[in-house]
């Protein structure tokens, strides 16, 4: 396989706020922004672009694989900022993390209402 993931546009009600939120949570690197895009770079050089679409948008699910130390820092940030979070995607186990797939995981909403999942072990 030679295909690799390069970039995605994440629909945002406030691109600058989203850039700040994701930058803090994912410890993402600053990237030059242009036009309607506020940009960050995460692992493997993947570009996250935040932009406001012309109309309404449906929430999406984005999962990020973190190492254990990064997960600890991200979870401390989530708790420190009082961000509502859950151990499960159905949002039944509020304020908890899970221990699925021999790792840890947590679900939360970003400022534009997208579902984020932070995990320490890949599913496959």
Task: Show where each model-derived region lies.
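A short, sequence-level motif marking secondary-structure junctions
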Residues: 52-57, 123-124
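Core segments of cupin and vicinal oxygen chelate
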Residues: 2, 9-47, 54
